[in-house]
Amino acid sequence: MTDNKNHSLISDIKSQIKKFSEKALTLEVGNVISLGDGIVLVDGLDNVMLNEIVRFENGVEGMALNLEEDAVGVVLLGDYSNIKEGDRVYRTKRIVEVPVGDVMLGRVVDALGKAVDNKGNIVANKFSVIEKIAPGVMDRKSVHQPLETGILSIDAMFPIGKGQRELIIGDRQTGKTTIAIDAIINQKGRNVNCVYVAIGQKNSTIANVVRELEAHGAMEYTTVVTANASELPALQYIAPFTGVTIAEEWMHQGKDVLIVYDDLSKHAIAYRTLSLLLRRPPGREAYPGDVFYLHSRLLERACKLKDELGAGSITALPIIETQAGDISAYIPTNVISITDGQIFMMTSLFNAGQRPAIDAGQSVSRVGSAAQIKSVKQTGASLKLELANYRELEAFSQFGSDLDDETKRILKLGKAVMAVIKQAPNKPYNQTDEAIILFTVKEKLIPQVPVERIQDFKEYLLNYFKGTKLRADLEDKKAFDKENTPAFRCAIQKAINSFLNNSQDFKPCEEAEQTAFDKFFNENESIVVDGENDFNFINEEVSLKPTTETSEAVQIEEKVQDFVEPQEILETNKMEENHIFEEVEPEKIICEHHEFEIAENQEKIEGQQVLEDTNHEYSIYETVEQSGEVDNDESKDDDLEVLVPVAEIEHDEAILDERENRNWVFSDSAVSEVEKQTIMISISSNEAEQLFDNAKSVVFFKVTPKYPVEKVLVYVTSPVQKVVGEFDLLKIDVNSVNTSWNKYRSSSVISSRKEYLEYFNSHKEAHALLASKVYKYRKPKDLASFNMNKGPSGFTYLK
């Protein structure tokens, strides 16, 4: 029995000896010589690679960045509080790599690709090293597709193509990040993945960016890589390489990617910090000699691949922060020479309220024009020239008042162009809309619109063309040709006339233009228009008593001939308001709960017109003047007018001093359900005179501010923006446009019905702000001294 056991044991030993391999597992180990400021000197790692990950005894990792003869300089990628001299350091024989693929979409990660958004760990099937050689010359294709930013001035003057590197440069607080975020938001639905790399930013700033992207649904196709200001310099150094590595994976899959580096100035500072701590010799501005190579190898990885490699692209928007507008500093000049153009943000323009504050003179796009669609290229080509002429003459015009007509024309056009390219954040345009807006500049039509109304006119113009065959033709052709150009010229002239409600100054279209215009609109085109204006005469001036409950939402569907213009609708409303009735075809009125037809047989009884519905007990009684004519200047509905107390004018010097010398600032928490707020509104100088000098107590606005409101600060918009006074708010009354005018016209700061209708053109409701006591400042205050954010339709909420 014992012999059998021994025999079995010997057999097992022999079997193990046969399987023995002579290969030995080698483990390279070094020791910590010194450490400090996130840098560790290690000896004993003679075969370590550049950018290789090394691991310390406590599990913290570092990256070998300096390979010297007697030691290795390692930058730490984690907490080094527990590392001490003499600790062992192990090679891992792998380069820094991060997870890539669609699993990264919608995530916020650190410089090592680890999730920091509290949405769980990232489970990736593929990893990629962060340092790669950029695609070669023969692997690339020229830029030929536009990347739409949705920002009018950029798409028109400095277009960006897919695969381009376009620098955004300027001082702090000039709107650089806003442009980049708007560009990301505008990629929604365009099959473009986005990467936003935040380098050295505050955590609160990054959180705001993420919230803004989430609010616009942009995080669905975006990855945010963050190395905030409190992170180790090594993490700030590798963050942009992590971002472009994530982007490259999608590019090689044939997808288009937009990457934003915010910003490379802080990236260069982080690299300078590491280099000085590693005892590398400093150069200009203490930057190491290879700082140019640092950014060139990063930005060269953005490109457009040729079709054989999938035709994917990476478009890079690096951001550089300048000091006092100095673009000749070391890092700005380096990055300008690497990129394919720059967008220069100007502090003076930003402070003057020009947003985006782009300096057209110093900005340029060297390759993007090849990617512009033809319609934008046709209309945007003259934009830079018009602005250059305006800038040149603007300086000279300040030295004298005697200007010739040509100079006045150029200055007027230039001011209009500056207003045209103003654009609020997160309000992108598609390129067809941009082409239509730019057409008004190219054809010199925009100066007809007052500068202060151009922002409203742009929205009006786009709504004017919305859903028309003319716009569809432009979107299909992507160009202005001999057929649609005269039609657009005629249509825009009609739109301007309609917007200004000024038919006596209307410039009729030439015969050829009118013919081209008519070609795009035929008699069979049915347009559904909003019925609020058309049926004001029913709602306000006539007794309409249905037997069953009806909805307030009423629409009219009618056959119209040619192109239905808002001006024509407005004129129809005026006729109806003034009791001018003619024989009309039966119209179908569509209500939410009821449907009825106005009876075809209309009876006239003792000077009254009766319209009866046979299915419902509706009766509409309207007095008709025997002559058939009524004064067009004013409505005769005196019954609706209410008596509003005259506003009390405050004369007490002490009270005025107290009111005038308070400091107001905008507050995110200013609008609450409990605390009463102060709002700021803008009115014309004439309206301000009526309010403060003549004690008119009603100010009209298009929208209602958030409640509750106690005080209202007032600033005038011309000739200069000045805060001229304030008033205590009695109440806010909301009615339809006609009702508000009929009720408050005698107390209104707006003196004429024509001016009132111009202001409320295309709006359903008027909001009357009633003042109880007014306080006129003796020294008007500069609007720029108020720290504020713009609210809806001129409202600013203050504390």
UniProtKB/Swiss-Prot annotation:
Name used for this protein in its record: ATP synthase subunit alpha
Source organism (scientific name): Ureaplasma parvum serovar 3 (strain ATCC 700970)
Annotated GO MF terms: ADP binding; ATP binding; proton-transporting ATP synthase activity, rotational mechanism
Topology versus the membrane: Peripheral membrane protein
Cellular compartments annotated: Cell membrane
Residues at the site labelled Required for activity: S363
Enzyme Commission designation: 7.1.2.2
Keyword Ion transport: yes
Keyword field: ATP synthesis, ATP-binding, Cell membrane, CF(1), Hydrogen ion transport, Ion transport, Membrane, Nucleotide-binding, Translocase, Transport
Top EC class, one word: translocase
Binding site residues for ATP: G170, D171, R172, Q173, T174, G175, K176, T177
Segments of this protein annotated with the region Unknown: 550-799
Region (ATP synthase alpha chain): 1-549
Quaternary organization: F-type ATPases have 2 components, CF(1) - the catalytic core - and CF(0) - the membrane proton channel. CF(1) has five subunits: alpha(3), beta(3), gamma(1), delta(1), epsilon(1). CF(0) has three main subunits: a(1), b(2) and c(9-12). The alpha and beta chains form an alternating ring which encloses part of the gamma chain. CF(1) is attached to CF(0) by a central stalk formed by the gamma and epsilon chains, while a peripheral stalk is formed by the delta and b chains.
The organism's place on the tree of life at top rank: Bacteria
Gene: atpA
